[in-house]
Each structure stands twice: as C-alpha cells, then as structure tokens.
C-alpha cells in the first residue's frame, strides 16, 4: 500500500508543478494582451481552461546504481529530448519521509496522437545504436519503471503565490485519498466549498488536486500543499491554523463516509535532473 500511495502522491506533485505554472503563465499573458472587441456570440467552451495532461514515469533505481542512472539523465536523456523539441521534463524524489531511490519523471502530453508515432522522440534523436546502448545501461540501473497518464484538476485547485513564482516550490505535503465509490461528487463539492477557502485564508503557496486517469486507482484523488521549508511544514496543518482545533475537527467530520483512506508523504523537486523551456 505504501509503495502504491507514494506513486500516486508523486504523480500529483509532478502535475502540480507543470499545470499550475503553465496556468500562471497563461494568466499573465492574458492580462498583458490588448483588449479585443466583444464577439457577437460567445462560444460555450471559448473560455474553458484546456485540460492539462502529463506522462509520468515512476522509476525505482538500484541503490548502488543511483550515480550511473543520474548521469544517464544528465548526459544522454535530457540533451536528446531537448534536441527533439521537448520543452519540459521534471524529476521529483522523496524528501526524507518516504521510500528512497524512487524518482518520478514527468513530461507534458501535448497530444495523445504522439503515441501513434512508431518511434519515441528519444529513439529518433539518438539513433538505433545509441538508443540500444542507452537501453542496456538503463536496464542495469533500474528495478522497475511504470508510466501513468494524469489529468490536472485545476477546477479543484488554488494557485496562490504560484502565479508570481519563477520556479517550483522546494517541498510539498502530498495526500493520497481513495474516495468511497459513488461519493466523488460529494468530495469535489467539499473541496470547493470548504477546502479552497481555508487554503486561501492560510495564504499557502499553492494547493493542487489531480486524478490518475490511466494506470491508477479509479477512485483516487491526490492533494498537494506547497511549502518552501520543513520549518513551515512544522507550523501545522492549514486547517488547524485557520479553523482552530474545534473547527478543524468539525471540518474533518464532513469527510466521514466520503474518504475511504488517505496517506501522506513529503516530496521535493530535483532541479539537477530537470529542464524547462526557459533554461
């Protein structure tokens, strides 16, 4: 259970970094754009936020091969993907609390049609001989690798200070939740009516929810609260700080019969193994 939960938690953190920053950039661009004449008839979905999909690969690395695996990412994979036109690749890992030697790698999915291509961007760029060499070295380094398709739930998220940040927060408290079948709508309503107001009042860096659509728990949601230090985390839950002990107890009671299980961990962004279009 803990290994599965960590995978789901990591997925949410990865998605949060790309989705929230992307939306922040889009919002800033929209504010700077000149005003356009109002359309005669507005299209129903004209202002809808496009879905944010990401490909996430969870890799368990052999303890004695961590350095070799990291070198492959820095010297082979990242340069090749940049050359292939991939704009972003983010890597995350456990921050003290969780399993060691696990890494989560994320790249945005621009279109699902990309998976209809017979060759991956990495294979195309490296060529057959270099790609086979990379595969052989990678197999010697890893225990397992599992890829997911995740959907960001921006309608259940609060961007907070993410809009003005130039990079990802250092840490995140990530909570994996399994919802009671048939209670998903109740959970989402509670997030909108009760959770988001608390996060805004607590002035958190950002709060994010995602769903794993392919390869994960069909009833699973994952929430992330961002922090810049363990000292900030040590100040206590935003719900306790905003609502007080009695208010927090009443708040959590609302989730009885809605949340079947939850598990919490802390994760951090690894800048040395990541790249973005700005770099």
Predicted regions and their residues:
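N-terminal acidic, proline/glycine-rich, low-complexity intrinsically disordered segments
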Residues: 2, 20-29
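Bacterial N-terminal signal peptides
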Residues: 10-20
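Short S/T/G/P-rich N-terminal loop/turn motif that feeds into the first structured element of a domain
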Residues: 25-279
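N-terminal secretory signal peptides that target proteins for export/translocation
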Residues: 1-7
């Amino acid at each position: 259970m803990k290994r599965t939960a960590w995978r789901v938690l990591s997925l949410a953190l990865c998605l949060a970094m790309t989705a929230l920053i992307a939306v922040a950039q889009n919002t800033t661009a929209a504010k700077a754009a000149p005003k356009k004449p109002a359309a005669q008839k507005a299209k129903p979905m004209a202002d809808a936020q496009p879905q944010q999909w990401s490909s996430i690969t969870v890799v368990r690395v052999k303890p004695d091969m961590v350095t070799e695996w990291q070198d492959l990412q820095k010297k082979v994979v990242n340069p090749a993907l940049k050359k292939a036109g991939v704009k972003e690749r983010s890597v995350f890992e456990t921050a003290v609390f969780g399993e060691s030697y696990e890494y989560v790698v994320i790249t945005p999915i621009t279109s699902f049609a990309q998976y209809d291509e017979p060759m991956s961007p990495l294979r195309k760029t490296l060529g057959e001989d270099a790609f086979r060499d990379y595969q052989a070295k990678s197999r010697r380094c890893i225990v397992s690798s599992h890829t997911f398709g995740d959907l960001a739930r921006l309608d259940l998220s609060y961007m907070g200070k993410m809009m003005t940040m130039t990079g990802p927060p250092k840490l995140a408290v990530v909570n994996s939740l399994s919802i009671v079948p048939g209670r998903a709508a109740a959970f989402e309503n509670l997030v909108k009516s009760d959770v988001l107001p608390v996060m805004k009042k607590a002035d958190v860096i950002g709060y994010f929810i995602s769903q794993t659509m392919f390869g994960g728990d069909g009833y699973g949601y994952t929430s992330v609260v961002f922090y810049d230090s363990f000292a900030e985390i040590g100040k206590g839950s935003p719900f306790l700080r905003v609502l007080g002990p009695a208010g927090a107890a009443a708040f959590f009671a609302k989730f009885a019969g809605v949340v079947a299980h939850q598990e919490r961990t802390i994760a951090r962004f690894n800048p040395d193994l990541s790249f973005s279009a700005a770099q």
